[in-house]
């Protein structure tokens, strides 16, 4: 089934070129089934690229999905054209009185900044707190996970000595939780973060069920018992070359980054990496939409 996104959004032409079923708003209005409505809080600097990555994953299910794009504030972006933000993104005040079937809160390049020093922290805290009453299930990603854990469990930011960057093997929990239904016992996923999410700390201080982790990455996937919050510390939405792009960006900035682990063929950055996490990424987002959103959300709010 298709994903329904706003007319004119750049992601529409990109996805259509990849033969991904994208439905126009006009056509969607003639569908008799009730579509899911998701709120997408995009905290990443390169918003268009992030939109495309997530929408690829959200489109690969039998469910029709409508997307509302949300920005946390109106600051002038250095990486996204202002007309794009003004055209496609809503402010929180516009949607505060609505309810949503699902919500995604992306990561942000704020790993080494205290929450109190994040300029939009108060607004973000308000949005995340609001989501508990107005969203059936919210999926947090990377830095968004740290923000959610701070707000819901008062967990402080834990930083690693070195950035975790690369593609790592994870172990799936022996659980009947439908979020990992169909997962292999082990699977690969990319990470790109300074934040640490030790599994033992998460188990000790929260009620989360850890559904996948590894000794290297710590917790990768966890959920609350009521399925209302999902936490994904990696970046299953990433394209094959995203880690490469980040590595070259940091090189150009003089940061002397480490080579992403288990990523470039023969650890040679001149070679093109493969995407070896695509199938499990699609399964994760499909399971979330089906079992945590569609099967739980009320037909009428």
Curated annotation (Swiss-Prot):
Top-rank taxon: Bacteria
Active site residues of this protein: 142, 235, 237
Site positions per UniProt: Important for acyl-CoA specificity: 111
Subcellular locations according to the entry: Cytoplasm
Gene3D superfamilies given in the database record: 3.40.50.880
Catalytic activity, EC: 2.3.1.31
Catalysis performed (reactions): L-homoserine + acetyl-CoA = O-acetyl-L-homoserine + CoA
SUPFAM superfamilies associated with the record: Class I glutamine amidotransferase-like
GO biological process, one term: L-methionine biosynthetic process from homoserine via O-succinyl-L-homoserine and cystathionine
Statement: the UniProt record of this protein carries the keyword Aminoacyl-tRNA synthetase: no
Uppermost EC category: transferase
UniProt pathway annotation: Amino-acid biosynthesis; L-methionine biosynthesis via de novo pathway; O-acetyl-L-homoserine from L-homoserine: step 1/1
One of the record's GO cellular component terms: cytoplasm
Residue numbers binding substrate: 163, 192, 249
Main location: cytoplasm
GO molecular function: homoserine O-acetyltransferase activity; homoserine O-succinyltransferase activity
Keywords: Acyltransferase, Amino-acid biosynthesis, Cytoplasm, Methionine biosynthesis, Transferase
Residues under site feature: Important for substrate specificity: 192
Function: Transfers an acetyl group from acetyl-CoA to L-homoserine, forming acetyl-L-homoserine.
Family: Belongs to the MetA family.
Record protein name field: Homoserine O-acetyltransferase
Organism: Succinatimonas hippei (strain DSM 22608 / JCM 16073 / KCTC 15190 / YIT 12066)
Taxonomy of the source species: Bacteria, Pseudomonadati, Pseudomonadota, Gammaproteobacteria, Aeromonadales
Name of the coding gene: metAA
């Amino acid at each position: 089934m298709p994903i329904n996104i706003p007319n004119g959004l750049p992601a529409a032409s990109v996805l259509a070129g990849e033969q991904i079923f994208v439905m126009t708003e006009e056509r969607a209005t003639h569908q008799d089934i009730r579509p899911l409505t998701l709120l997408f809080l995009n905290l990443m600097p390169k918003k268009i690229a992030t939109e495309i990555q997530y929408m690829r994953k959200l489109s690969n299910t039998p469910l029709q999905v409508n997307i509302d794009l949300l920005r946390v504030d109106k600051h002038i972006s250095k990486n996204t054209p202002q007309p794009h933000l003004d055209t496609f993104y809503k402010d929180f005040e516009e949607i505060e009185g609505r309810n949503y079937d699902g919500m995604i809160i992306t990561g942000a390049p704020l790993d080494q900044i205290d929450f109190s020093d994040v300029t939009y922290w108060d607004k973000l805290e308000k949005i995340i707190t609001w989501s508990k009453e107005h969203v059936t299930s919210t999926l947090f990603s990377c830095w968004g996970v740290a923000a959610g854990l701070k707000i819901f469990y008062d967990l402080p930011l834990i930083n690693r000595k070195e950035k975790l960057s690369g593609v790592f093997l994870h172990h799936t929990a022996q659980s009947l939780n439908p979020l990992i239904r169909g997962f292999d016992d082990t699977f690969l996923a990319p990470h790109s973060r300074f934040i640490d999410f030790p599994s033992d700390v998460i188990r000790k201080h929260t009620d989360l069920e850890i559904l996948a982790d590894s000794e290297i990455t710590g917790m990768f996937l966890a959920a609350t018992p009521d399925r209302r919050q999902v936490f994904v510390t990696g970046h299953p939405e990433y394209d094959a070359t995203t880690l490469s792009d980040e590595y070259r960006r940091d090189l150009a900035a003089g940061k002397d980054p480490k080579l992403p682990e288990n990523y470039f063929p023969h650890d040679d950055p001149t070679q093109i990496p493969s995407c070896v996490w695509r199938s499990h990424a699609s399964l994760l987002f499909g399971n979330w939409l089906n079992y945590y959103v569609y099967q739980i959300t009320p037909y009428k709010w």
